[in-house]
């Protein structure tokens, strides 16, 4: 009920933390509020959006596993993930799955962290100028979710940065550091400005 009510209130113009309580960061609630504003409020709007997020998670997981495994093995591992975690009900309350999660911050966070893993892998193996900025942005978006995803994103990014530092002879390019910092701080700055005006 909380996920539906909060998104509905935000779609009607309420401000999170002022007009309606929120337990976690604002990103997921405002994404859901935007969906309700566009498609109208309703459980099935969130279910379809959640299934799209789940499809993104499955694709990201498969592609990530594919980097180290054969296609059949990566597909089998992704299928196990789908069967065990996708639509399971381990309690009488059916809200601990991807179609109707207890907190959308979990599903959105998982997708962001998997996308971050792809970007960091690319930064390590096929560096592009946009990798550090995008990695910072994805890590910065996790700051607007739940703490466990913030820790995961920062640990992964820190490890990748450390590895990049040592593999480049003990130095990082200033442009990479600045791009990462800009991406990392942008979501929080935008959130602070938004809530400061409301």
Residues of each region from the PLM?
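Extracytoplasmic catalytic/substrate-binding loops of multi-pass membrane glycan-assembly enzymes
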Residues: 1-6, 16-34, 41-44
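Loop-to-helix entry region of an early transmembrane alpha helix in multi-pass inner-membrane enzymes
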Residues: 26, 30, 40-59, 78, ...
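Transmembrane helix irregularities
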Residues: 38, 83, 111, 141-146, ...
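Transmembrane-helix motifs of polytopic, lipid-linked glycan transferases
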Residues: 48-77, 82-87, 115-118
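Membrane-interface micro-motifs in multi-pass membrane enzymes
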Residues: 84-117
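Membrane-interface transmembrane helices that cradle and orient dolichyl/undecaprenyl
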Residues: 108-134, 161-171
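Membrane-interface alpha helices of multi-pass inner-membrane proteins
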Residues: 130-147, 152-160, 182-192
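Transmembrane-lumen/periplasm boundary regions of multi-pass, lipid-linked membrane glycan transferases
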Residues: 168, 174-198
């Amino acid at each position: 009920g909380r996920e539906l009510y909060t998104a509905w209130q935000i779609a009607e113009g309420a401000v999170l933390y002022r007009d309606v309580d929120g337990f976690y960061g604002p990103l997921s609630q405002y994404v859901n509020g935007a969906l309700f504003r566009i498609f109208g409020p309703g459980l099935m709007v969130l279910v379809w959006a959640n299934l799209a997020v789940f499809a993104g998670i499955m694709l990201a997981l498969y592609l990530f596993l594919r980097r180290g495994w054969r296609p059949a093995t990566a597909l089998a591992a992704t299928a196990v993930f789908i069967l065990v975690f996708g639509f399971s009900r381990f309690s009488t309350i059916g809200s601990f799955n991807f179609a109707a999660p207890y907190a959308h911050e979990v599903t959105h966070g998982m997708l962001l962290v998997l996308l971050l893993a792809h970007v960091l892998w690319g930064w390590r193996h096929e560096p592009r100028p946009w990798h550090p900025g995008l990695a910072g942005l994805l890590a910065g978006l996790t700051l607007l979710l739940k703490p466990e995803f913030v820790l995961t994103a920062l640990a992964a990014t820190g490890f990748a940065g450390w590895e990049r530092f040592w593999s480049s002879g003990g130095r990082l390019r200033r442009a990479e550091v600045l791009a990462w910092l800009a991406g990392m701080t942008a979501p929080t700055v935008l959130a602070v400005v938004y809530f400061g005006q409301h």
